[in-house]
């Protein structure tokens, strides 16, 4: 997120043109109140919603799947950015005066890039996981430990990418106010600044969206456009339907992110083409609207999960059960939905390889949690009743194979 704040300083053209001029971006009180209400909605909805998402996944063993760990990372990044940067962005954009000191100036320009990087590459990791599970079902899947390592690598790369902008951030005292700005090394045509901003835009927007778009296109063709050979039982179609729902949900999440951030990146690349853009009187209102849209991307995912996924909906209902207009629902579904799947897995082993190996991110008939209980031959004996010894052995071996490819 190059410039969420870096170029906040550029919003005031007098920073780079005439540091003795007073702040020319002043708006009536009623506009400030309306914008304040709009930004407050983002902070409250994002922080509360994403914290509930993290609780739903981490507090329920059946929800601790590999891909759900990436959703936890996504929720953490978005809640953090909403909590630490949205209000500061708003106050600085409205008053064009920095109240928070040098340290927070550096953090303010540094953290949003890291958070957006972590968010989009968490979505990329989910897309890659879906791609491998559906297109290459027999390939080894990430373990819980490997998933945590990937998340750590994402954050290390995010911090490295954001470091230059934080390092060169500084405050400057003017006759009537203090501003937070970025002092890039001197070079003709601001080459360092341009190269950095273009690289950041490519790395946190266009490149990951290209990868995600390819992955979900191939997955979509496989799940919707192709006739999948094998057993055509109701159980089989039920599982494929569940997988389609999850892919639809993640596509909505990615498209929402892309739509929210596109105007922001365009806004901060245009001045390299038209340097006088920030001198326009209307630019502050345009910036506030574009920044609100970008920041609002942090609050939509919990709403999407709640609307499109049954198990998240149960979790949200339980979290807000104290509200008079919300019914708690069957909270046990969060823990028990996977149990039925576990008990019946052996009996549906004969369906196609795709059915036994595709796993979903969340919802009924999902992948088993990495740290969840594993099925044992004895549990299969309970479902097969008085089967012969040879039948029991066959079912045990079949289930063992199925469990291996699902994990």
UniProtKB/Swiss-Prot annotation:
Identify this protein by name: Substance-P receptor
Q: Which InterPro entries match?
A: GPCR_Rhodpsn (IPR000276), GPCR_Rhodpsn_7TM (IPR017452), Neurokn_rcpt (IPR001681), NK1_rcpt (IPR000046)
Q: Which GO terms describe its molecular function?
A: substance P receptor activity; tachykinin receptor activity
Q: Which residues lie on this side of the membrane: Cytoplasmic?
A: 55-64, 129-148, 220-248, 309-407
List ligand-binding residues for CP-96345.
197
Could you tell me the keywords of this UniProt record? Cell membrane, Disulfide bond, G-protein coupled receptor, Glycoprotein, Lipoprotein, Membrane, Palmitate, Receptor, Transducer, Transmembrane, Transmembrane helix
Q: Which family does it belong to?
A: Belongs to the G-protein coupled receptor 1 family.
Q: The organism's lineage?
A: Eukaryota, Metazoa, Chordata, Craniata, Vertebrata
Annotated organism of origin = Homo sapiens
Q: Kindly list every residue the record annotates as glycosylated.
A: 14, 18
Stretches the record annotates as Disordered: 364-407
Identify the CDD domains for this entry. Answer: 7tmA_NK1R
Q: Where in the cell is it found?
A: Cell membrane
What quaternary structure, including any partners, is listed in this protein's UniProt entry? Interacts with ARRB1.
Impact upon substituting residue 192 to H: Display properties similar to those of the wild-type receptor
* GO CC terms, sorted: cell body; cell surface; dendrite; plasma membrane; postsynaptic membrane; sperm flagellum; sperm head; sperm midpiece
One of the GO biological process terms: aggressive behavior
| Pfam families, per database record | 7tm_1
Q: How does it sit in the membrane?
A: Multi-pass membrane protein
Q: Which residues, per the entry, are lipid-modified as S-palmitoyl cysteine?
A: 322
* Keyword Glycoprotein attributed: yes
Those parts of the protein on the Extracellular side are 1-31, 87-106, 170-194, 271-283
């Amino acid at each position: 997120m190059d410039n969420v704040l870096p170029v906040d300083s550029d919003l005031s053209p007098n920073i780079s043109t005439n540091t003795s001029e007073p702040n020319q971006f002043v708006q009536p009180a009623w506009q400030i109140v309306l914008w304040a209400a709009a930004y407050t909605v983002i902070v409250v909805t994002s922080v509360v919603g994403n914290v509930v998402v993290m609780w739903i996944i981490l507090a329920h063993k059946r929800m601790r799947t590999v891909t759900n760990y990436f959703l936890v990372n996504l929720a953490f990044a978005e809640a953090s950015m909403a909590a630490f940067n949205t209000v500061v962005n708003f106050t600085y954009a409205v008053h064009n005066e920095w109240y928070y000191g040098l340290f927070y100036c550096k953090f303010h320009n540094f953290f949003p890039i890291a958070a957006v990087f972590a968010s989009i590459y968490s979505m990329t990791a989910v897309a890659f996981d879906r791609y491998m599970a559906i297109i290459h079902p027999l390939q080894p899947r990430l373990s819980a430990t490997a998933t945590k390592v990937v998340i750590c690598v994402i954050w290390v790369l995010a911090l490295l990418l954001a470091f230059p902008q934080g390092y060169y951030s500084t405050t400057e005292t003017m006759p009537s106010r203090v501003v937070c700005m970025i002092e890039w090394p001197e070079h003709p045509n601001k080459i360092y600044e341009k190269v950095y901003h273009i690289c950041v835009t490519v790395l946190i927007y266009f490149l990951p969206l290209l990868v995600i778009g390819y992955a979900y296109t191939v997955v979509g063709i496989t799940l919707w456009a192709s006739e999948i050979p094998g057993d055509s039982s109701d159980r089989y179609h039920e599982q494929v339907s569940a997988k389609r729902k999850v892919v639809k949900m993640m596509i909505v999440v990615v498209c929402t992110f892309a739509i929210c951030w596109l105007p922001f990146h365009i806004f901060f690349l245009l001045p390299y083409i038209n340097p006088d853009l920030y001198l326009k009187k209307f630019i502050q209102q345009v910036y506030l609207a574009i920044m609100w849209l970008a920041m609002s991307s942090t609050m939509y995912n919990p709403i999407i999960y709640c609307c499109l996924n049954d198990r998240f909906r149960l979790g949200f209902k339980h979290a807000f059960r104290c509200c008079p207009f919300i019914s708690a629902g069957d909270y046990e579904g969060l823990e028990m939905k996977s149990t039925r799947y576990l008990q019946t897995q052996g009996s549906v082993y004969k369906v196609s390889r795709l059915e036994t190996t595709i796993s979903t991110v969340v919802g009924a008939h999902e992948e088993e949690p990495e740290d969840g209980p594993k099925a044992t031959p004895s549990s299969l004996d309970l479902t097969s009743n008085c089967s012969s010894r040879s039948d029991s052995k066959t079912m045990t071996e079949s289930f063992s194979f199925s469990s291996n490819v699902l994990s």
